[in-house]
A protein has these predicted regions:
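A generic structural signal for ordered alpha-helices
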Residues: 27, 108, 112-115, 140, ...
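Flexible beta->alpha loop and helix N-cap segments adjacent to enzyme active/binding sites
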Residues: 1-91, 135, 145, 154-155, ...
């Protein structure tokens, strides 16, 4: 589920699709059903709202895709307040029209709360459409396993509800690189399994989250030596040092192991701070992340 892509058909033609369902059998996946790009397009809908209504970047440098910013806004809004205006742009068919955006744009320009309310409408609509689509396929093709991919799968507000929506699903997998960059993984896998007919690889031996560059102590020391006029450093072996620094309201960066693939930090690189400080969220957003005040953070929880 994404903004669109091309599927090659057995008759030699290509069809542009935005939502498709597949079933995994042994070492291959097989198409169940595809949806034409002009019928349902949640990905394009988010792109249009991100750029046309909120004036944010839909992709590319320097900001990349800022749909995640809109998703963060949605948690502070009333999804019903501007539903009548939302319905003018998004008809009953889940596809964005090329209609008049001016009313929504004026609201966003004049009042910050309106941004949150419009974002909440967008998120609620997304939840409804995706829930119906996935539910339809699970009803027709019952399965205890569900795998999601495509840029829309980055919408964690929506995906976080899936286990509640479908309690019959026992296993949910969302690749850490579900958007276009994941083609670098999907292409070789397709050849490996479909073309060369190699067997499946057990999930525990096939995690794709940590495929980035790994920095070793020698290379770290080399960089520190290069920048010794600007950076002071001290080697510490006591783990309590991090806790003491956080207690004094310092912001700590930590990393270890290979860098994560995808757009979410998954533990190998993290920013740590004391959540008890009432000003810490604003400090990190303003001075470290350089982003809007409402952007949220994920807690780190020790098992």
């Amino acid at each position: 589920m994404d903004g669109g892509g091309e599927d090659y058909k057995s008759n030699g033609e290509y069809i542009s699709t935005t939502f498709s369902a597949w079933k995994g059998i042994d070492n291959k996946i097989y198409e169940i059903e595809i949806t034409d790009i002009n019928e349902i397009n949640i990905g394009v809908m988010w792109d249009r709202f991100t750029t046309n209504v909120f004036g944010l970047s839909g992709g590319g440098p320097p900001y990349g895709c800022q749909a995640g910013t809109v998703m963060a806004m949605s948690s502070m809004g009333d999804s019903k307040k501007y539903k009548h205006l939302f319905d003018k742009i998004v008809p009953h068919e889940p596809y964005v029209s090329n209609g008049d955006w001016s009313e929504l744009q004026n609201l966003v320009l004049n009042e910050e709360q309106s941004k949150f309310d419009i974002a909440a409408s967008l998120q609620e609509y997304t939840n409804t459409v995706i829930r119906e689509l996935i539910g339809k396929y699970l009803e027709k093709y019952p399965s205890k396993n569900l795998c999601l991919s495509g840029g829309v799968a980055l919408n964690s507000v929506m995906t976080g509800k899936i286990r509640h929506w479908y309690p019959q699903v026992e296993n949910i997998y969302i690749d850490p690189v579900p958007y276009d960059a994941g083609l670098a993984l999907g292409g070789p896998r397709y050849i490996w399994h479909h073309i060369l007919n190699n067997p499946r690889i057990k999930w525990e031996d096939n995690a794709t989250s940590y495929l980035g560059y790994e920095y070793h102590e020698d290379s770290i020391q080399e960089e520190l030596d290069k920048n010794k006029d600007r950076v002071s450093h001290k080697v510490v072996t006591d783990d309590d040092v991090v806790g003491l620094l956080m207690k004094d309201n310092n912001v700590i960066s930590v990393y270890g192991g290979p860098s994560e693939s995808g757009r979410r930090a998954l533990g190998n690189r993290s920013i740590l701070a004391d959540p008890r400080s009432p000003d810490m969220k604003d400090t990190i957003n303003e001075k470290v992340k350089h982003r809007q005040w409402f952007r949220p953070f994920a807690p780190s929880i020790i098992r």
